[in-house]
Amino acid sequence: MKAFPVICLGFAIFSSSICVNINILQQIGYIKQQVRQLSYYSQSSSSYVVVKLLPNIQPTDNSCEFKSVTQYNKTLSNLLLPIAENINNITSPSPGSRRHKRFAGIAIGIAALGVATAAQVTAAVSLVQAQTNARAIAAMKNSIQATNRAVFEVKEGTQQLAIAVQAIQDHINTIMNTQLNNMSCQILDNQLATSLGLYLTELTTVFQPQLINPALSPISIQALRSLLGSMTPAVVQATLSTSISAAEILSAGLMEGQIVSVLLDEMQMIVKINVPTIVTQSNALVIDFYSISSFINNQESIIQLPDRILEIGNEQWRYPAKNCKLTRHHIFCQYNEAERLSLETKLCLAGNISACVFSSIAGSYMRRFVALDGTIVANCRSLTCLCKSPSYPIYQPDHHAVTTIDLTSCQTLSLDGLDFSIVSLSNITYAENLTISLSQTINTQPIDISTELSKVNASLQNAVKYIKESNHQLQSVSVSSKIGAIIVAALVLSILSIIISLLFCFWAYIATKEIRRINFKTNHINTISSSVDDLIRY
């Protein structure tokens, strides 16, 4: 018997443990798609980012006057003015009016909120609460304004950490400042205008929701990346103690931002960022699988296994991940959603085909192929597989559930009219003849269920007929039983009567005999008495 390798995605601990057998599962249409590292997160703290939107330009020998900076400053003021006004309206009650609501001593301008949900009011409360820290950070505006560094850490008296970020300053430092003395003022002004214009266009696009109401519209991922620019990794490294890349954290939406203050004179924006606490479980892998139909026992079927499992060491669980955030390499969850698997399911995952359960398929709209690392895994018994380069039809034997097509067998593949280019070799070096019993196939599809229901209804009708017949038989048996009981009772009574009669006759016989004996004795005594009397007379 040929030995088949087993691929364990986790870490082997015991030699007898159960591992996921990727190769065997792929042969029955259960294909591994993605493996992610499991991490847990919670929103625990906040950090502040001071975004300086107007860059510093080093003075030049020819004292160039950059008109582009003046125009950029004017346009940026028009962009930030509505945001600043909205923040002031929310954080301050309307003048001359007593109609405002207080949350734990915090005054909120109700008119600025308008019709707001509970979550939006909570965001407004958070905005007002952040004003204290924002003002403390803004008090350091002179040191922030004077710096020429792209990322600058500042601390105020309470050791509140803030990070000053100048996304456009990084571009100025690396490109513009090195050329100030080597180019004419007009060329530099045009080049600076181009850079500032592009940055301004990007800000206008991503901050459009904040122009309506910054308290009710959190900063999007695009806005955060635009604000931070190329300094995103440095900011993430300064605020988070994790080895996960900044792109993964931002794409998962774990860092949420909110504008809490705008300083128009200095062109500074203070953004409150909710910083998560991230903990990675090193030996926990979440594996996504994709199921396609397979040809088993002369019919199209699909395996019944979960689409996503969690593997820790050599143990597996079902993992729905309904409340998790997924990226390409990580899955971030607030809690563990693992669900236990049955022993049969674990054995099936380990490659024991006899423990697997399949469901039959009725209908033509079904997943019958999947692309896997540059190859194609398809059910070529349920769709037309035609290789165009070289040109030949691909046949799938009866003992193969699916067919793996790689570069060695075909370069251009057509599946029911869809053309694919094969670019990789398959890493599967063996194929197993599958033997699956009929008892492993169940019906779960709607069309199959309707068919089975009709069969069940027919069986129920037959059962009702049989029940009626059995009731009739039971009724006849019941009447016969009553008659039999009466006869038995009569026989018993007759026997008892006969026994009583015999006993009475026997008693009468004994009594008569005793009476006769007594009479005999009496007569005998009388005779003796008479004889004695006669003797006395003589």
From Swiss-Prot:
One of its GO terms (biological process) is fusion of virus membrane with host plasma membrane. Glycans are attached at N56, N73, N89, N182, N352, N427, N433, N457. It is found in: Virion membrane; Host cell membrane. Residues 128-156, 452-477 form a coiled coil. The keyword Coiled coil applies. Residues 103-127 are annotated as: Fusion peptide. The chain crosses the membrane at residues 487-507. The record marks R102, F103 as: Cleavage. The inactive precursor F0 is glycosylated and proteolytically cleaved into F1 and F2 to be functionally active. The cleavage is mediated by cellular proteases including host FURIN during the transport and maturation of the polypeptide. GO terms for cellular component: host cell plasma membrane; membrane; viral envelope; virion membrane. Residues 508-538 are cytoplasmic. Residues 1-19 form the signal peptide. Its main location: virion. Keywords: Cleavage on pair of basic residues, Coiled coil, Disulfide bond, Fusion of virus membrane with host cell membrane, Fusion of virus membrane with host membrane, Glycoprotein, Host cell membrane, Host membrane, Membrane, Signal, Transmembrane, Transmembrane helix, Viral envelope protein, Viral penetration into host cytoplasm, Virion, Virus entry into host cell. It is a single-pass type I membrane protein; Single-pass membrane protein. It comes from the Viruses. It holds the Pfam family Fusion_gly. Residues 20-486 are extracellular. Disulfide bonds join C324-C333, C348-C356, C380-C385, C387-C410. The record marks P95 as: Determinant for fusogenicity and cleavage efficiency. Homotrimer; disulfide-linked F1-F2. Interacts with host LAMP1; LAMP2 and LAMP3; these interactions promote the cleavage of the viral fusion protein F. The 2 coiled coil regions form a stable six-helix bundle. Class I viral fusion protein. Under the current model, the protein has at least 3 conformational states: pre-fusion native state, pre-hairpin intermediate state, and post-fusion hairpin state. During viral and plasma cell membrane fusion, the heptad repeat (HR) regions assume a trimer-of-hairpins structure, positioning the fusion peptide in close proximity to the C-terminal region of the ectodomain. The formation of this structure appears to drive apposition and subsequent fusion of viral and plasma cell membranes. Belongs to the paramyxoviruses fusion glycoprotein family. This is Fusion glycoprotein F0. It comes from Mumps virus (strain SBL-1).
